[in-house]
């Protein structure tokens, strides 16, 4: 029996974040990863509380709004031996943080990104997030949303993410398996998680999702894994097409997986051969409290 942390979890009753938290904890435990080598990074929003509520001795970094992927990138590149997992809301990660989201994909850094997708800014009383569809009017909006929705899966595919999946917060066991695969994947991984907000999104509710979601694993012939270069384009196009399926039927599962693309860490090693053995976190930065960096020499070199 695992003893619970004496921390009050203040999410609203029925919040999809409970399922995400549980799936994430189980994924880390079942993979047998030393929790002390796991860093969970979050931004601002209801999802930002994940590191505080995680019932594992992980390292948590609760960062600035929209900057969690930037922080995670610095953590991973300074110490590639760590397992870095990012938790962002759809507003946090796909609004103010969209630039970082896109560039993580093109770099293909070995980081897993979990997007808590509920269509609203739940922490600030339910404004429309980038994933709320045009024409929808949730309870806090005075008028229907007039902007088109961001498609997280399609954006990730176009940006270069090499693992792209979608889960559902109320199907915890299925979500757990997706998170495990995202963590094990070598490269940038996205799990877009459909996460009902019972307080502010009265359209995309548990009842609404329950009769629409279906598993790609149950589709005859569905195979998202790229095993050889000549398959990549076909599997990519297949994933793009499937990512736009929304409405009466909503697919969950793995849309695309390609480990043939070298990670950013691999590419960095081609420029810095000893990077893997002597990465920044292993380097000495001070001697007796004095920095080893000689900035005076740098200033002299740059002085005009």
From Swiss-Prot:
Names of the cofactor(s): [4Fe-4S] cluster; thiamine diphosphate; Mg(2+)
Binding residues annotated for thiamine diphosphate, in chain numbering: 44-47, 65, 91-92, 122-123
Gene Ontology molecular functions: 2-oxobutyrate synthase activity; 2-oxoglutarate synthase activity; 4 iron, 4 sulfur cluster binding; magnesium ion binding; pyruvate synthase activity; thiamine pyrophosphate binding
Keywords: 4Fe-4S, Iron, Iron-sulfur, Magnesium, Metal-binding, Oxidoreductase, Thiamine pyrophosphate
InterPro entries named among the record's database cross-references: 2-oxoacid:Fd_oxidored_beta, 2-oxoacid:Fd_oxidoreductase, OFOB, PFO_beta_C, THDP-binding, TPP_enzyme_TPP-bd
Keyword check for Amino-acid biosynthesis: no
Residues annotated as binding [4Fe-4S] cluster: 12, 15, 46, 197
CDD domains in the cross-refs: TPP_OGFOR
Reaction catalyzed: a 2-oxocarboxylate + 2 oxidized [2Fe-2S]-[ferredoxin] + CoA = an acyl-CoA + 2 reduced [2Fe-2S]-[ferredoxin] + CO2 + H(+)
Enzyme superclass (EC): oxidoreductase
Job description of the protein: Catalyzes the coenzyme A-dependent oxidative decarboxylation of different 2-oxoacids such as 2-oxoglutarate, pyruvate and 2-oxobutyrate to form their CoA derivatives.
Name of this chain's protein: 2-oxoacid:ferredoxin oxidoreductase 2, subunit beta
Gene: ST2433
């Amino acid at each position: 029996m695992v003893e619970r942390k004496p921390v009050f979890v203040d999410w609203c009753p029925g919040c999809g974040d409970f399922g995400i938290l549980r799936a994430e904890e189980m994924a880390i435990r079942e993979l047998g990863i030393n929790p002390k080598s796991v860093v969970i990074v979050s931004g601002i929003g209801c999802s930002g509380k994940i590191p505080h509520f995680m019932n594992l001795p992980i390292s948590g970094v609760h960062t600035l709004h929209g900057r969690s992927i930037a922080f995670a990138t610095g953590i991973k590149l300074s110490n590639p031996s760590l397992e870095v997992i990012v938790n962002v809301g759809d507003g946090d990660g796909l609004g103010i943080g969209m630039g970082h989201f896109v560039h993580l994909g093109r770099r293909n850094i070995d980081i897993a990104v979990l997007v808590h997708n509920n269509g609203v800014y739940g922490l600030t009383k339910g404004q429309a997030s980038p994933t709320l569809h045009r024409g929808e009017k949730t309870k806090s909006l005075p008028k229907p949303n007039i902007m088109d929705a961001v498609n997280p899966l399609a954006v990730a595919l176009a940006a270069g993410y090499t693992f792209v999946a979608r889960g559902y917060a109320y199907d915890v066991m299925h979500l757990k398996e997706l998170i495990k695969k995202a963590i094990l994947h070598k490269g940038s991984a996205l799990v877009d998680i459909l996460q009902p907000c019972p307080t502010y999104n009265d359209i995309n509710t548990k009842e609404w999702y329950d009769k629409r979601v279906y598993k790609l694993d149950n589709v005859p012939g569905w195979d998202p894994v790229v095993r050889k270069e000549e398959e990549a384009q076909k599997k990519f196009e297949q994933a793009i097409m499937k990512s736009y399926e929304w409405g009466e039927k909503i697919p969950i599962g793995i849309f695309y997986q390609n480990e043939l693309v070298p990670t950013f860490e691999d590419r960095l090693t081609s420029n810095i051969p000893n990077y893997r053995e002597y990465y920044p976190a292993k380097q000495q930065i001070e001697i007796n409290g004095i920095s080893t960096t000689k900035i005076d020499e740098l200033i002299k070199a740059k002085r005009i």
